[in-house]
Amino acid sequence: MTPLIQIRQGVARHPLYRLRAPFDFTLHAGEHTVLFGKNGAGKTLLARQIAGACPLLGEARTDNLASEQRTQGGIRCLSFRDIYGGNEPAYYQQRWNRADEQVFPTVAEMLERAKPVGEEVSEETLRRVEETGITAHLDKTINLLSSGELRRLQTARMLFSRPKVLMIDTPFIGLDREARRSFTALLEELSKDLTLILIVCREADIPPFIRKVVSLSERTLTHTESREEFFQRRENEQKTLTPKPAPLPLPPTASPVPQGENMIEFCDVTVTYGSRHILHHLDWTVRCGERWALTGPNGAGKSTLLSLICADNPQGYACPIHLFGKRRGRGESIWEIKKHIGFVSPEMFSTYRKPLPAIDIAASGLRDTIGLYVRPSQQEREFCLEWMERFGAGDLATRDYLSLSDGEQRLVLLVRAFVKQPALLILDEPFHGLDDELTNRARSIIDAYMARPDRTLIMVSHYDEELPSCIDHRLTLSRQD
């Protein structure tokens, strides 16, 4: 059988995009494959070369699939970044403006834009799009879609190009338990008609229908093996692992704690967009020193609730909300609120696109800016570097942030939330895109940080096993559909 993709001793033409050694890669129709490795292992580099985005030297490639990139039936790549504002940093706060709702397209409009110009869409393609389930939401504007619904919309749009190979980066990121199950079922259904390549950094994210795993480590393709061989090897490696050194001890805290026992008070808070209630008559109090897990399905309003606390949502001025002992809308600036908060979220990752050294991205957390507008002192830079080393990101400090892998960028933004040692730590899915090792390390740092009695935590996660052991309260939201 002629393979769809055949690469022998592949080397990227541009030195910046090369793996450390030439690689071999073969893909046959229906041979659904996972590219697996830790953050920074080289998964994205390999994926770009497989997809033809990075030309190879010589005659390493013997198939013609990459040349079909701009035609029907080639390789298509799907990465689930936020699609609300095209990754524009200015849109980070504008997303929450109710008046902006009119600028968002509907699902039907987004699907129509994805159709090939001047060509009739085949019945087979329409069937595939129908299988995504997104056609049940044609009249919704995309800002009202849950993460799982957005995932289905982006997948459906890609199907109009009738790919032979669909490559998906971190397919389950940001999805709740039910959405993960549902999206896995969708991928399995799609696998009957096209060939899938999934890029993952966690073993738990390898779907049951995947039969082949390609592993990378330190920018080198190390193993190509069956699913069974992969899990057996990983089990054997776990038995011989050398314990990692403990993270650096935490520095003494110097950031002030706002006066008053209650950090946050919501009294009968309701938030609506159009005719839909996002939050409905919510009463909630967070006291100093409490550690909260904020849970609920995609679309339940968790990110909206956090936007009210972080002073990003203008509806906060009209709601009966007290932050750090003061009623919102009584003349305080958003910076007076933000100075007490360390924050990271998927939306921040999507919109923080600054070409700066990673240490400057981390240091921007000292002054709550998206970008670095005040040069940190040498002492501040050294302090930020200590925090990067604490999270295992010290070797990223001088690298251009935009040259890092998605997982490495997310790690730098997590460091950014800690550098000013805030009184209130708000972590919205902080382990998005992090491998198991970095997740465990970060969780232990959170526990150590929250051992201080005057620090408060609110953390969102769709994985209960990710929650740190310090969690002592839980607020569960439900969708108001």
Question: Residue ranges of each PLM-predicted region?
Answer:
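Conserved beta-strand-loop-alpha-helix hinge in the C-terminal portion
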Residues: 208, 216-244, 468-469, 473-481
